Curated annotation (Swiss-Prot):
Protein name (Swiss-Prot/TrEMBL): Holliday junction branch migration complex subunit RuvB
Keywords: ATP-binding, Cytoplasm, DNA damage, DNA recombination, DNA repair, DNA-binding, Hydrolase, Nucleotide-binding
Source organism per UniProt: Acholeplasma laidlawii (strain PG-8A)
Positions bound to ATP: L21, R22, G63, K66, T67, T68, E129, D130, Y131, R172, Y182, R219
Listed PANTHER family: HOLLIDAY JUNCTION BRANCH MIGRATION COMPLEX SUBUNIT RUVB, PTHR42848
Gene (name only): ruvB
Region Head domain (RuvB-H): start-end pairs: 256-337
């Protein structure tokens, strides 16, 4: 994977800089206003009753702030948070160890919760409902079960694939929130905040340009800011101007719509190889040399949001907007194929 591509694609990587940029309270968190309002009410009510917060499920595209919100919830509750991910929980013992280590009121955050093995997931059910663990011990022909009492805790799950969660697991979350792409003005606020954290001056036209190319995603906005800052520090007096921003983003291969070479490869695959579609996910993935899961989680959410593609029962279809972007003549009725 190239350096340019990684700015937009490696959305699950986190580093110390990104941790430094994270807001610590709901008041500091920019965007997702409806979610913040509801969380504030739920948190205040839980604190007033001196109870643990109901379990929370956060879902949406990568980079929209699910992990940050989980940490903020713990901060607002004044409790500790333990962070893990679905792939790290391979067996029942892994989950039991995590749950047994919690103190009363603590938050357990599981990223990519849809990737927990189903047999492990089932152990969560009683833990979430009754704060108990029922463990079956097998000893040759005899088996017995033991019950472990757990302290009250809050489970926060995050996923990019809401539909992959089992119905029993979804039903055990008391609050479910879908994070949306951020509005342009919200991304601008995030860019201005980032410039203050890094103590880099940026002019307003540069803020606007960088924000427009950030795909409505805070993590991308912050990463693009750091790359543009590099150009500014080497080529000017470190002030981030419109010219420097345009130069840096062009070098990174990101166009004025926030699309990169991989997006164009995807769209050309549908339009040129499959006559605009419909095309199945596996066929498309094979054509462009990408994993199906990456296409679903990273490529498609933004292209769907912006109207370049549609998902139909028969597969992916390129829209007239995609044809116009690629400079290919569009014929009415293609979407009805």
């Amino acid at each position: 994977m190239s350096e340019e591509k990684s700015v937009l694609r490696d959305l699950n990587l986190k580093n110390d800089d990104e941790l430094m940029l994270r807001p610590q309270t709901l008041n500091q968190y920019i965007g997702q206003d409806d979610i913040k309002e509801m969380l504030s009410i739920y948190i205040q009510a839980a604190l007033k009753r001196e109870e643990s917060l109901d379990h929370v499920l956060l879902y949406g595209a990568p980079g929209l702030g699910k992990t940050t919100l989980a940490q903020i919830i713990a901060n607002e509750l004044g409790v500790d948070i333990k962070i893990t991910s679905g792939p790290a929980i391979e067996k029942t013992g892994d989950l039991v160890a995590l749950l047994s280590s919690l103190s009363p009121g603590d938050v357990l955050f599981i990223d990519e919760i849809h990737r927990i093995p189903r047999f492990v997931e089932e152990v969560l059910y009683s833990a979430m409902e009754d704060y108990t663990l029922d463990i079956v011990l097998d000893k040759e022909r005899d088996s017995r079960s033991i019950r472990i009492e757990l302290p009250p805790f809050t489970l926060i799950g995050a996923t990019t694939r809401f539909g992959d969660l089992s119905h029993p697991l979804r039903e055990r979350f008391g609050a479910v929130f879908r994070l949306s792409y951020y509005k342009l003005e919200e991304i601008k606020q995030i860019v201005r905040r980032t410039s203050k954290v890094y103590q880099n001056e940026i002019d307003e036209k540069a803020v606007d340009e960088l924000s427009k190319r950030s795909r409505g995603t805070p993590r991308i906005a912050n990463r693009l800011f750091r790359r543009v800052r590099d150009f500014a520090e080497i080529m000017t007096d470190a002030v981030i101007t419109l010219d420097i921003t345009q130069l840096a983003l062009t070098k990174l291969g990101i166009d004025h719509k926030g699309l990169d070479a991989s997006d164009y490869l995807y769209l050309r695959g549908i339009v040129e190889r499959f006559n605009g579609g419909p095309v199945g996910l596996e066929s498309l993935a094979s054509t462009i040399g990408e994993e199906p899961g990456t296409i679903e989680d990273v490529y498609e959410p933004y292209l769907l949001q912006e109207g370049y593609i549609k998902r139909t029962p028969r597969g992916r279809v390129a829209t007239e907007l995609a044809y116009n972007l690629l400079g290919v003549k569009y014929y009415k009725g293609l979407l009805d194929n």
